Swiss-Prot record:
Family the entry assigns: Belongs to the MEC3 family.
Subcellular location: Nucleus
Protein name, as recorded: DNA damage checkpoint control protein MEC3
Subunit and interaction comment: Component of the checkpoint clamp complex composed of DDC1, MEC3 and RAD17.
Superkingdom as given in the UniProt entry: Eukaryota
GO biological processes: double-strand break repair via homologous recombination; meiotic DNA integrity checkpoint signaling; mitotic DNA replication checkpoint signaling; mitotic intra-S DNA damage checkpoint signaling; nucleotide-excision repair; subtelomeric heterochromatin formation; telomere maintenance; telomere maintenance via recombination
GO MF term set: DNA binding
A GO CC annotation given for this chain: checkpoint clamp complex
Role: Component of the checkpoint clamp complex involved in the surveillance mechanism that allows the DNA repair pathways to act to restore the integrity of the DNA prior to DNA synthesis or separation of the replicated chromosomes.
Keywords annotated in UniProt: Cell cycle, DNA damage, DNA repair, DNA-binding, Nucleus
């Protein structure tokens, strides 16, 4: 298998790459990087196997999509379908390399997958003559190389830096188990959240973070419905119904609803054909790496009102509600603060999805066609039934 990427820090596309990796690093220590012919997919979930190499579970999954054309060179080759290469990576290590790269007088950053045989041997005994035996998943390195200019670029010296980030390659069977969650579209409401830098951004941030102060809170209900006065606007509420106290936090500002096109009953939240097809990577087992030289009083907070709920609202034709873990909602507040375009989708009594888009402008200055956007999607399964 071969992997070589080149990206320039002077381009806006580098910001997409850095933002995605940094966002994952803030939420999780590890992530799976899945390189395919068309894009890089970053997957992270809080549940890991004892080996640290296999991700499983369906709560709090973070799926990020980075199009291949953000790189000036994108060379990925393997014997698996779509040339897939999957590996587990320590996010902090990769972010530290990017920070070091940004402090230099910029040239391109080259990332290559390199074999590291010395990292794959472990001495299993102390008896003389006993051979070293390889570990389970092959451990390799993402070699990150760039040049730093000292002094003036014309007359100064150049220093080459190479940093190696350890990664653990995933076998075909392990990669196949990492499947994007499905969203049930039969009863789904979607809301375009106010931009964080817009008129209502600061007030909506207060709404999202209203429950962060309650450290012992386990579950909360996300309740959404259509505004009876205006069909193109929705309403959003956060309800707490614990044993000893109840709370109802309502968003009183504008909230745009997104009208669904005809959708299958259950599909991934990412665009059809974008991320959904990558879960069928079931071919190839080779791990050979080639050189890649190729009870609370009612209060008001801005447009947020909090009060005791009177009674629970039964599901209606235009309502969706679901219980999720309070910790998952705290992750949503972090993601909302980081992106301009955010969509919240509520699948009744099944799941909640936060979809963040990263705009990349148009193909060129004379074109109106937009480039493929980067995506960060946070899937939250219900924590308990209604």
């Amino acid at each position: 298998m071969k992997l070589k990427l080149v990206i320039d820090s002077d381009s806006d596309d580098y910001r997409l790459f850095k933002t995605t990796i940094s966002t994952v690093a803030q939420l999780r220590k590890t992530a799976v990087l899945r390189f395919t012919t068309d894009r890089l997919i970053v997957v992270s979930t809080p549940k890991t196997a004892a080996s640290g190499a296999i991700l499983s579970g369906d709560q709090g999954q973070l799926w990020c999509t980075i199009p291949r054309d953000i790189f000036t060179l994108y060379n990925v080759a393997s014997i698996r379908e779509q040339n897939a290469i999957a590996m587990e990576c320590q996010c902090d290590s990769l972010v530290n390399v990017l920070r070091r790269y940004e402090r230099c007088n910029h040239g391109p950053l080259t990332i290559k997958l390199q074999s590291t045989p010395e990292w794959n041997q472990v001495h299993t005994g102390i008896q003389q003559g006993e051979e070293n035996k390889p570990m389970g998943n092959p451990i390799c390195a993402l070699s990150c190389a760039f040049t730093e200019h000292l002094g003036y670029e014309d007359s100064g010296k150049e220093v080459s830096h190479v940093f190696k980030v350890g990664v653990r390659l995933l076998y075909k069977s392990q990669d196949a188990r990492i499947v994007e969650p499905m969203v049930n579209y039969t009863k789904l409401l979607m809301f375009q959240l106010p931009p964080v830098n817009g008129e209502y951004g600061s007030k909506f941030t207060s709404f999202v973070k209203r429950l962060d102060r309650y450290a012992t809170l386990n579950h909360l209900m996300i309740y959404g419905d259509r505004n009876s006065d205006r069909s193109d606007e929705g309403r959003l509420r956060l309800l707490v119904q614990e044993l000893d106290w109840k709370l109802d936090v309502q968003w009183r500002g504008p909230l745009e609803m997104i009208v669904q096109d005809d959708q299958p009953s259950a599909v991934p939240a990412s665009e059809p054909g974008l991320v959904g097809n990558v879960r069928h990577l079931n071919a190839g087992t080779s791990m050979q790496i080639e050189d890649s030289e190729m009870d609370i009083e009612a209060t008001d907070i801005g447009n947020v009102s909090t009060s005791r709920p009177s009674t629970s609202v039964s599901p209606q034709e235009q309502t969706s509600q679901v219980f999720i873990k309070a910790k998952d909602w705290k992750v949503c507040s972090k993601l909302y603060d980081s992106f301009e375009e955010v969509v919240l989708a509520i699948s009744h009594d099944e799941s909640c999805v936060l979809h963040c888009s990263l705009d990349r402008g148009t193909v060129d200055e004379h074109s109106t066609k937009s480039k493929e956007r980067g995506q960060i999607i946070y899937y939250m399964a219900r924590s308990k039934p209604l």
